[in-house]
């Protein structure tokens, strides 16, 4: 058997994957009451500065009142005062503060903080924390490493401009808490955010450099190897020991061990051993995107090196490396971020070689900046200037790449079976090359076939796949995984807290949004609406309807329109508003933003309609010439018809608007409604008994936030809906609510409780 150790480790990883699939981890429950003040005792295992706070991570935690052991670590947020070294690393402390759990995702595509911190083994946070007692013993080594890191961060702050300092601290010291947000978003959008990860490039450059320096000093090889690995382990501990750093240090140690034992170093075996050791400590790391991307990059470089390799033009080797990494990263990126930066592999042809120069300049900056100013000032500023030039060049390249056509490919999250087929194609290409796709008595001497070489017996040789077949297979796999066809009509009521946002997709793939804002969630556009749209593969909205201009209906849309960095990158073709809109400050700002982006604004009134992809929107309110001083009263009310199913979308309309809409429906001979979006988040001053009696809605959707200060939905509204026999669904209870419409029937699917109900 070739690579027996690698096979054992891979078998372990596969076993872990199967086990996790068959036994998914239950959603963590907060063992202490949310918002309660508690006193905890635990050991300080990590600490770092985040803005004006000291974040301390405690392990082996127990609570005094109520007395219980905490399953997992706790993040404590302390005020960063003059005594920034308290508490010391490795010490046992008692700390008091307010309990805060991690929120779970409530919409498709939304970041799941609860699941993320569950993988990291963190149970909850403690805000407004204060150390009330500290043991005398502590870890001198860990505390020393922390002080070194703080000192080096100070060097960057003194020598570099704030923006450059924040980026260099992230690249060399793993300090991402103060990272410039604009640079972070730009690099992420361009596909070069990997420069912020402490990984193989850092360990290879620093570790091998240090090892070769020791060898030049005639120090015995075993001692050089042990010291070099020890220094890299200390560096990893200092920068936070992420999964990518842990992987790189383990592989570095195995590489030096192979040299000492005079054995051949095998990258794939080292990678498999590193994966097994990490998963033995925490199996759920297998679902961590950082783990997947870090190991995937090395897997692509190692496994696919012979499959995708320029035979004649060696100068194309860097490009072939980017293509190999793309083949492994592509499904991971789509499953995690739902989009792919098309020009990232070209950017990395420049960025990765330049990173060695940037890191070298950063090290000189740190070294010289740590010396007395008389000696180190000039070299530190010179190196700092080089860092600035390189970072400015990176930003310029990223900005230019994002302005190119098709810069960002929004695909959406692929179906699991599509990901499996893509991976199967890549594995088959590897197996076909490694073991031969078939046996031939005599391998062809010319043509496109690649001969593996040694005969297996009686002249038989393994023959690889033709290059054209490889290309066709990869192209077919990429096409398959990037397809995201519409499957009938879908209507999703997003959970935006106290607000409204409705996404509608036609059977033909047209995309519409009705409202998009919240008064209880900040940055709703960035963190909820845009991730949801990209999860569904939406890069362009055919129309956005704003029922009225209250912030809880437009704040997220305004974010998208104000997005100058193009990080949200959702194109809006047209904006539709109520003809009775109040032309106040929000209206003027909206008009200005739309003019800047060249988005036409249409004012709708009763009788107007729009048809697209089998959908029909009909405006029922406001009527022509309707005037009001109330934004809520000016709300658009629309009837949506799709494949024999009808829905009424009401905004925050008030009683007189409901009456006018009801009269129009009655005049048209309309019998009843299937889906009713409750007006004004379930307010008792809307959703009148007369309207509900006329509509007789089969299903009512109420969009409101948990524990909102308005008391929505009001008990009177719920009682009225129950009297009409409506099934009531609330986003505060179920998260996003999706209605799938097919041939006159519809099913209701909820995001949190994962329930499914079929209607009509």
What do these predicted ranges mean?
Residues 7-12, 180-347, 361, 411-486, ...:
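Hydrophobic alpha-helical transmembrane segments in multi-pass membrane proteins
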Residues 13-194, 527-531, 540, 588-611, ...:
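Membrane-interface helix/helix-cap signal primarily in integral membrane proteins
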Residues 117-250, 256, 543-545, 617-618, ...:
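Aromatic-rich juxtamembrane segments at the membrane interface
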Residues 279, 283-287, 402-425, 429-543, ...:
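Core dinuclear metal-dependent hydrolase active-site scaffold
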Residues 298-406, 698-703:
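Alpha-helical transmembrane segments of multi-pass integral membrane proteins
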Residues 551-596, 600, 697:
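Active-site HxH/HxHxD metal-binding segment of metal-dependent hydrolases
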Residues 574, 658-735:
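Cap/insert and terminal regions of metallo-dependent hydrolase folds
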